Swiss-Prot record:
Tissue and organ distribution: Almost exclusively expressed in the podocytes of fetal and mature kidney glomeruli.
Disease: Nephrotic syndrome 2: A form of nephrotic syndrome, a renal disease clinically characterized by severe proteinuria, resulting in complications such as hypoalbuminemia, hyperlipidemia and edema. Kidney biopsies show non-specific histologic changes such as focal segmental glomerulosclerosis and diffuse mesangial proliferation. The disorder is resistant to steroid treatment and progresses to end-stage renal failure in the first or second decades. Some patients show later onset of the disorder.
Intervals, Cytoplasmic compartment: 1-102, 124-383
Protein name: Podocin
Keyword Glycoprotein on entry: yes
Positions of the UniProt region annotated as Disordered: 1-76, 355-383
Lineage: Eukaryota, Metazoa, Chordata, Craniata, Vertebrata
InterPro entries to which the protein is assigned, alphabetical: Band-7_stomatin-like, Band_7, Band_7/SPFH_dom_sf, Band_7/stomatin-like_CS, Stomatin_HflK_fam
Biological processes per GO annotation: actin cytoskeleton organization; gene expression; glomerular filtration; metanephric podocyte development
Superkingdom: Eukaryota
Known function: Plays a role in the regulation of glomerular permeability, acting probably as a linker between the plasma membrane and the cytoskeleton.
PANTHER family given in the database record: BAND 7 PROTEIN-RELATED (PTHR10264), PODOCIN (PTHR10264:SF127)
Organism: Homo sapiens (Human)
C-alpha cells in the first residue's frame, strides 16, 4: 500500500511539472514583486501547468486595469482609458539614438567647449523658471529623459536647440459657432476653455498649433454633445453640459500632453425669429398667470363680502355703524358734495321682506306740493 501511494504521488508530481514547494515559492515571489509577473507574462491557459513555450515571444509590458471598474465609474473610466492610450505615443517619441557622424560632432563640440572653458560656459548654460520646462533637440533628435527645469541646464550651442513650454494655466476663448439642438433649433454659442501643458516632450512632438487644435476640438465636441439636448436643457443645465464636455475633451487632449481643467459656456445667441416666438410664448404664459391670480383674488374678495354680509345681517347695530362710517368717508373724500341722509328706519322698512311683498312705499309725486307733517294753525279772524 505504501509503495502504491508513493508511486501515485510521483506520478502526480510528474504530470504537474512542479512540486508544491516550488508553487509556494513562486506565489511568494509574485506577491513580493507587486504583480510584476502579471504585467510581463501573458495570461496562463486554464488547462496547462506551464506559463508558455520558450519559442513564443513575450508580451510587451502594459498597465493592468479592471475593465468592470472602468465601465462602472463613468467619467473616471473614460479618463483612465484615455490615459492608457496616451502611453503609446509617448513611447513612440523616444529617440532612436545618434549615429557615428553625429557622435563625432558631439565629441568635437565638447572638446571645443573644454578648450575655451572660461568663456564658453556662458553660452552653454541657461536658466529655466519654475513654471517652465525645456525640451532639447540634438541634431534633430529628441534627447531621452524628462524635460529640463526648473533651474540651470546644459546644452551644446552648435548642435542643440531648445524649446521652452509654459506650464501655467492657459485661457482660450472659443468664438461663436452654430449648433443644432435635439428639437431642431439652430443657435450659436461661445465658450471659454482652461487648459495646461502636462507633457512638454509629447506636446512638441504631437502638435504644431496648440490653440487651433484645442479650439477646433472644443467646437466639434460641443456640437456633438448639444445635438442630444433640447433648447430648454441647454439654457438650464449649463453646469452638467460643461462637465460632460470637460471629460470628453480630456480623453482626447491627454494624448497630446494637455490637461483640460475647465470649460464654461459663456453665452447663447438665438436667431431673431426664435427670440420673437419665445417672447410671445412667454408673454402669453405671463398673461395667463395674471388672469388666474386676478380670478383667485376676486373669488377671495366675494367670499369675504359674503361672510361680512352674513355677520351684518345678524347684528343691526353693526349695520348702523357701517352706514355712519360710509357717510363720514363720503364727507371727507368729497367735501363739495352735499349728502342728505335718510332715516335709518325708512331704510329698514324698504329692506324688510314684508315691504318687498307688498310693494314699495308710496312716495309723493314731485308735481304736487308736499304738505308738512305738522301744519301751522291759522290765526283766527279776531286776531
Amino acid at each position: 500500500m505504501e509503495r502504491r501511494a508513493r508511486s501515485s504521488s510521483r506520478e502526480s508530481r510528474g504530470r504537474g511539472g512542479r512540486t508544491p514547494h516550488k508553487e509556494n515559492k513562486r506565489a511568494k515571489a509574485e506577491r513580493s514583486g507587486g504583480g510584476r509577473g502579471r504585467q510581463e507574462a501573458g495570461p496562463e491557459p486554464s488547462g496547462s501547468g506551464r506559463a508558455g513555450t520558450p519559442g513564443e515571444p513575450r508580451a510587451p509590458a502594459a498597465t493592468v486595469v479592471d475593465v468592470d471598474e472602468v465601465r462602472g465609474s463613468g467619467e473616471e473610466g473614460t479618463e483612465v482609458v484615455a490615459l492608457l492610450e496616451s502611453e503609446r505615443p509617448e513611447e513612440g517619441t523616444k529617440s532612436s539614438g545618434l549615429g557615428a557622424c553625429e557622435w563625432l560632432l558631439v565629441l568635437i563640440s565638447l572638446l571645443f567647449i573644454i578648450m575655451t572653458f572660461p568663456f564658453s560656459i556662458w553660452f552653454c548654460v541657461k536658466v529655466v523658471q519654475e513654471y517652465e520646462r525645456v525640451i532639447i533637440f540634438r541634431l534633430g533628435h529628441l534627447l531621452p529623459g524628462r524635460a529640463k527645469g526648473p533651474g540651470l541646464f546644459f546644452f551644446l550651442p552648435c548642435l542643440d536647440t531648445y524649446h521652452k513650454v509654459d506650464l501655467r494655466l492657459q485661457t482660450l476663448e472659443i468664438p461663436f459657432h452654430e449648433i443644432v439642438t435635439k428639437d431642431m433649433f439652430i443657435m450659436e454659442i461661445d465658450a471659454i476653455c482652461y487648459y495646461r501643458m502636462e507633457n512638454a516632450s509629447l506636446l512638441l512632438s504631437s502638435l504644431a498649433h496648440v490653440s487651433k487644435a484645442v479650439q477646433f476640438l472644443v467646437q466639434t465636441t460641443m456640437k456633438r454633445l448639444l445635438a442630444h439636448r433640447s433648447l430648454t436643457e441647454i439654457l438650464l443645465e449649463r453646469k452638467s453640459i460643461a462637465q460632460d464636455a470637460k471629460v470628453a475633451l480630456d480623453s482626447v487632449t491627454c494624448i497630446w500632453g494637455i490637461k483640460v481643467e475647465r470649460i464654461e459656456i459663456k453665452d447663447v445667441r438665438l436667431p431673431a425669429g426664435l427670440q420673437h416666438s419665445l417672447a410671445v410664448e412667454a408673454e402669453a404664459q405671463r398673461q395667463a398667470k395674471v388672469r388666474m391670480i386676478a380670478a383667485e383674488a376676486e373669488k377671495a374678495a366675494s367670499e369675504s363680502l359674503r361672510m361680512a354680509a352674513e355677520i351684518l345681517s345678524g347684528t343691526p347695530a353693526a349695520v348702523q355703524l357701517r352706514y355712519l362710517h360710509t357717510l363720514q368717508s363720503l364727507s371727507t373724500e368729497k367735501p363739495s358734495t352735499v349728502v342728505l341722509p335718510l332715516p335709518f328706519d325708512l331704510l329698514n322698512c324698504l329692506s324688510s321682506p314684508s315691504n318687498r311683498t307688498q310693494g314699495s312705499l308710496p312716495f309723493p309725486s314731485p308735481s304736487k306740493p308736499v304738505e308738512p307733517l305738522n301744519p301751522k294753525k291759522k290765526d283766527s279772524p279776531m286776531l
